[in-house]
Amino acid sequence: MTAARLGALDPTVFELAARRVMARCDELARITSTPGAITRVHLSPEHARVNRLAAEWMREAGLQTRQDAAGNQLGLLPAADPEAPVLMLGSHLDTVVDAGRYDGIVGVLMAIEVVRLLQRRDDDTSGVDAPARSPFDFGLEVAAFSDEEGARFGKALLGSSAVAGTWDDAWWELEDPDGTTLREAALEFGLDPGRVSEAARRPSELVGYLEAHIEQGPELHARGEPLAVVSSIASARRFQLVVEGEARHAGGTPYDMRRDALLGASEAALAVERICSTQHHIIGTVGQFEAFPGAMNIVPGEARFSLDLRGEFDGERDRVWDQISRELDDIMGRRRLRWHTREVHNAPALFCAPLLQDVVGEGIRSTLVPGSAVDGSILGSGRPEDPTTLFSPAGHDGMAIGAITDVGMLFMRNPDGVSHHPDEAVSLGDVALGIRALAEAVAHLGAEHRRT
Ligand SMILES: [Zn+2]
C-alpha cells in the first residue's frame, strides 16, 4: 500500500479507529490490582488478563497471536514471504502504581489499529476468507511489552530486554515488596524461567521498531502542535547517596558542634536543582530522602537520598555529574560531613535511527499537510511544515530494543504534560492524527524498503 492510497482512505476511518483505542484504554484501566486506581504490574493476575484481552483484539484485527517466554503479548501479520523480517510496532501494557490510562497502553492499541488499516486480504475465489497479510516486503508485528515501568521488581524494561536478548539471569533473584522473587513470580504466571532466552529476537528478524507514545511533558501542548518526531531517548544515571555526620542530643548540642547529615543532604538537593536548571536538557531529581535515626530529638547522624540524572547526551550528563560531585565535596567539607555514593543504573542515550525519524516525519507531514503525501509538492518549498522534533527525557521500550534494531518514535500531545498520574490525558482527535501518522510512516517505510 502506498502513502497516497492510504491518504485516499475516508478520514473517518482514523476517527473510528481512535474511538476504539480510547474505549479500550478505558476498558484496560478497569483491570487493576487497586480498585479506584490503576496499578498493573509485571507477572500479576492483571498482567495475564490484559494480555488475554490484547490477544483477542489482535486476532480480531487479523493477527496471529502468541505470548512469548517473557510474558510479552505479540501479534503477527506476516508478509507474503514467511521468512521476511518484521517491523515491530508497539509499547507496554504495564503501569506504575496509581497510573494514568494512556502511558504505553495507547501505543499498543494504536499499533493494532495501524495493522488493521494497512493489511491486505488477497482475493480468494474459493469463497473462504483468505488470511490477512502485510502489503509490504516485511511483516508487521504488534508487541505489547510486559514490563517497561519496573514498578514491581525495581528493574525497568524486563519485557523488552528479553526480546532484545540482553536478559541478565541475576534479575531472577530480584524481589518485589512482598519478598516474591522474579523467578517465583514467573513460575506462578506460568512461564518457564529456563526458557526466557526463547523470547530473544535476532537482528536479522527485524526491520525496525516503531512506537507511538504520549509525550510525558508539556512541550507539544505549549507549541500548540499535536504530533512530534522523537530524536532520542534520554541517557540516565541513578545514584544512591549517603551522607554521614554525627547523631547527638537535639537540646544539648550547640550549632557549631553539630554535624547534621540531613542539612548537608538538603543543601546537596538544592545544589542539584541549581546546577541542572542552568543546563540545556539536563534534568536532575532527588526523589527519595531519609534521615537517621529519624527521631524528633536527635540531630540526624545519617541521611540517604537518591539522584536521577538524565540528559540528551551522555557526555553532557557525565560532565554535570562531575560538577555535582565537586559541589558535594564542597558542601560536606564545609559541614564536616562525609559522603559516598553507589551508582545503581547507567543507560546511554538511545538515538532514533535517521531513516525512522524521516518516515515518522513524513507520516506527520502527510497527516497534517493535506496533499503532501500524494504529489510531493511540499518538497520544493523549503518544507515550511517540518514536523517538530523532540528529545524524550522519559525512558521507553526502545532503549532496550535499540540493542537489536533501529528505533523510531512518534509523540502525541499531552495536555498539561501530566503523566504517571491518574490525570494523564490525550485527546481523541490527537489519537486519530497519531494513528494516521503512524500508518503513513509505516507506508513510507514500506516504499523505502522496496527501493533498497
Ligand atoms: Zn511508557
Task: Annotate each PLM feature.
Residues 33-78:
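A non-catalytic alpha/beta surface segment that caps or lines the substrate-entry region
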Residues 39-43, 285-294, 306-313, 338-358:
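A short beta-alpha structural unit
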Residues 2-44, 171, 343:
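N-terminal capping segment at the start of a domain
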Residues 21-24, 29, 87-91, 376, ...:
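Zn-dependent metallopeptidase/amidohydrolase metal-coordination segment
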Residues 89, 98-148, 237-243, 249-275, ...:
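Alpha-helical metal-binding/catalytic segments enriched in His/Glu/Asp
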Residues 135, 147-148, 152-314:
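Midchain, well-structured core segments that form catalytic/ion-binding scaffolds
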Residues 231-233, 249, 253-278, 326, ...:
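His/Asp/Glu-rich mid-to-C-terminal helical/loop segments that flank catalytic regions of hydrolases
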Residues 15-18, 29-30, 181-231, 269-274, ...:
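Active-site-adjacent substrate-binding region
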